Amino acid sequence: MTDQTLPQLPLPSSWRPLRLQTLVILRWLAVIGQTIGVLFVNWGLGFPLPLLECLALIGLSAVFNIGLTFRLGPHYRLPSRIAALQLAFDLCQLGGLLALTGGLENPFALLLLAPVSVSATSLPKRQAFLVALLAAVIASVLAVMHLPLPWEPDQHIVFNRIYVIGIWGSIICGVVFISAYTNRVAHDARQIADALAATELALSRREQLSA
């Protein structure tokens, strides 16, 4: 038996490339949820908001998704830099939507943590850190720059500044925790998976040599 027929041990890896389809599906879910939310607030609750601008931002995300799917194909494996740029786009799109609908006063501001979570579990540390940093910057900008929260036309709701600072602090804590702890847990899990795969291949190779 020649050495060419023997299985080769895998090289250790700290991350595995994401499939484009994974981010595309998550983005479609975001598009559907954002569309339903905006239309329900505007027409269902009767709260005025900049509807055309909100729908334009949501449409931009949909067009981005369609373009990526046709250009690269759903099974394309994304390099870490490209995956990080896509998550950065998602953060900026969500940040723009939140800026039009109340900033951090909007209860859906918590969704800023979603791209951070995806990056922490699937990207190398450097790219995951940059995505987390962008989320923190967007949250900080939204704390001071945003349109009023959609509410009853004859009422103007004003949140205490300390409360808004508390929301900002909780999001920043979430960003730090997810980017550090989740990334470390995912890294350890990948190392264990790599070690098990290497052990299985080594045993298989030994069996073939002794056959």
Residue ranges and their predicted role:
Residues 35-39, 66, 95-99, 117-118, ...:
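Alpha-helical transmembrane segments of multipass membrane proteins
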Residues 58-69:
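Central hydrophobic cores of alpha-helical transmembrane segments in multi-pass inner-membrane proteins
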Residues 14-29:
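N-terminal membrane topogenic signal
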Residues 92-103, 110-130:
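Generic transmembrane alpha-helix motif of multi-pass integral membrane proteins
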